[in-house]
From Swiss-Prot:
It comes from the Bacteria. This is Large ribosomal subunit protein uL6. Gene3D superfamilies: Ribosomal protein L6, alpha-beta domain. GO terms for biological process: cytoplasmic translation. Part of the 50S ribosomal subunit. Residues 152-177 are annotated as: Disordered. Belongs to the universal ribosomal protein uL6 family. It holds the Pfam family Ribosomal_L6. Keywords: Ribonucleoprotein, Ribosomal protein, RNA-binding, rRNA-binding. The lineage of its organism: Bacteria, Pseudomonadati, Pseudomonadota, Gammaproteobacteria, Alteromonadales. It comes from Shewanella oneidensis (strain ATCC 700550 / JCM 31522 / CIP 106686 / LMG 19005 / NCIMB 14063 / MR-1).
């Protein structure tokens, strides 16, 4: 059994956490995030820490408390430091450029792909083959990165495609005659 829920989340300086019934709001230097807390979890804010206690008798309460603790910790880190995800384009002619709030991708198709960025996500292209996504919501950053990677996932024979910066692509050997 995981003990994630037993560890409290500390609130760093410059971050304000408010609880209104089952709605938790976290505000910081980078922005603010709001989340509705599950009814199986009681949240207590005291002495600069947030504690998560499962409701007695609720089914799966410890699991929900652990999940809630992890999500709230990501909210606190996001509004204080922010999150970033790097993508790499590997392949001849694969390019990315920023056009306003959209990313224009050339990935070997007969047409360029335009990926619209949702509110709360900013992108940067330090080079033609690199994309850096930044924001306060970890889930949203990961979702946008997965959508961009989904246009052309790395293939196992040559390794071409869109990959995460820290991703290891498992390579296969070509068939021999």
């Amino acid at each position: 059994m995981s003990r994630v829920a037993k560890a409290p989340v500390s609130i760093p300086a410059g971050v304000e956490v408010t609880l209104n019934e089952q709605t938790l709001t976290v505000k910081g230097a980078k922005g603010s995030l709001t989340r509705v807390i599950n009814n199986a979890v009681n949240v207590v804010i005291e002495n600069g820490v947030i504690k998560f206690l499962p409701v007695e008798g609720a089914v799966g309460a410890w699991a929900q408390a652990g999940t809630t603790r992890a999500l709230v910790n990501n909210m606190v880190v996001g509004v204080s430091q922010g999150f970033e995800r790097k993508l790499k384009l590997v392949g001849v002619g694969y390019r990315a450029k920023l056009v306003g709030a959209d990313i224009d991708l050339t990935l070997g198709f007969s047409h360029p792909l335009v990926h619209k960025l949702p509110a709360g996500v900013t992108a940067e292209c330090p080079s033609q083959t690199d994309i850096v996504l930044r924001g306060v919501d970890k889930q949203l950053i990961g979702q946008v990165a997965a959508e961009i990677r989904g246009y052309r996932p790395p293939e196992p024979y040559k390794g071409k495609g869109v990959r995460y910066d820290d991703e290891e692509v498992r390579r296969k050997e070509a068939k021999k005659k």
